[in-house]
Amino acid sequence: MPWIQLRINTNSDDAETISDLLMEEGSVSITFEDGKDTPIFEPKLGETPLWRDTVVVALFDAETDLTPTIAMLKTLPFLGENFSHKVEQIEDKDWVREWMDNFHPIQFGTRLWICPSWREIPDPTAVNVILDPGLAFGTGTHPTTALCLEWLDSLDLSDEEVIDFGCGSGILAVAALKLGAKNVTGIDIDYQAIDASRANAERNDVADKLALYLPEDQPADLKADVLVANILAGPLRELAPLIAERVKTSGKLALSGLLKEQAQEISDFYSQWFDMDAAAHKEDWSRLTGKRK
């Protein structure tokens, strides 16, 4: 069935109020969009921030008469008589199929492919990780994940012990195992990430080599030959002593989740423990690598 979509240009202060009112008016779905392509980086714990310029998008049944709803919105003092909005009809589609069509196998480096389960594997002789998009965790499409995957592909991981610090979907942990790592330890603060990592490891037949922990449960004597941490600049700085402690002498380190302008400061900080390399960049993001002193 077709739908009617109402788009309202507003700001972060009023978006939630408008959303509540539209739900009362019969909207079956509300989403928020960025009005001016403004990124949000490193929100505080527990925050779900909105963009300063936010578009509220409401979906209604096609039979809905929006005239009373728009009249009601015009009476709101923070919108006013001439508030910016757009009404359009949306034809029904197989939304699941359309969503799936957006994801294709992606190659990282020379050996590694990340493939959705519904796609044919392009190169059966390559190192193939089967991973479906889900939750808010990495699937290889974000530049920081891509930078880490390319780095892992460049290493000889045969018989190496690896730590994936902030494992999320487990994409880096699973990739390391498929690339030959002896074992991987994944650590994350989110129990959903632990579950997602375990499920993806099982799908790729490497679950027997993957140990997963919440931070408070990780072994005190844990050490690895290779450690990759794709988190954010704040946690990378805060956790630096612990991360350094986890890497064996002459072990390898990769840090990502960093904006370009944050890379030098983090590199300088980690140079207490590591011989740091020049940063690698992709779009606005950076990856740092180093060798444990």
Swiss-Prot record:
InterPro entries, per database record: Ribosomal_L11_MeTrfase_PrmA (IPR050078), Ribosomal_PrmA_MeTrfase (IPR004498), SAM-dependent_MTases_sf (IPR029063)
Top-level taxon of the source organism: Bacteria
One record GO biological process: methylation
Enzyme class, broadest EC rank: transferase
Amino-acid positions noted as binding S-adenosyl-L-methionine in the UniProt annotation, renumbered to this chain: T145, G166, D188, N230
Compartments where located: Cytoplasm
Pfam families: PrmA
Annotated catalysed reactions: L-lysyl-[protein] + 3 S-adenosyl-L-methionine = N(6),N(6),N(6)-trimethyl-L-lysyl-[protein] + 3 S-adenosyl-L-homocysteine + 3 H(+)
CC annotations in GO: cytosol
Main location: cytoplasm
EC number: 2.1.1.-
Single GO molecular function: protein-lysine N-methyltransferase activity
Keywords assigned by UniProt, alphabetized: Cytoplasm, Methyltransferase, S-adenosyl-L-methionine, Transferase
Annotated NCBIfam families: prmA
Protein function: Methylates ribosomal protein L11.
Family, per entry: Belongs to the methyltransferase superfamily. PrmA family.
PANTHER family listed in its UniProt record: ELECTRON TRANSFER FLAVOPROTEIN BETA SUBUNIT LYSINE METHYLTRANSFERASE
Name of the protein this chain belongs to: Ribosomal protein L11 methyltransferase
Organism name: Shewanella baltica (strain OS195)
Lineage: Bacteria, Pseudomonadati, Pseudomonadota, Gammaproteobacteria, Alteromonadales
Name of encoding gene: prmA
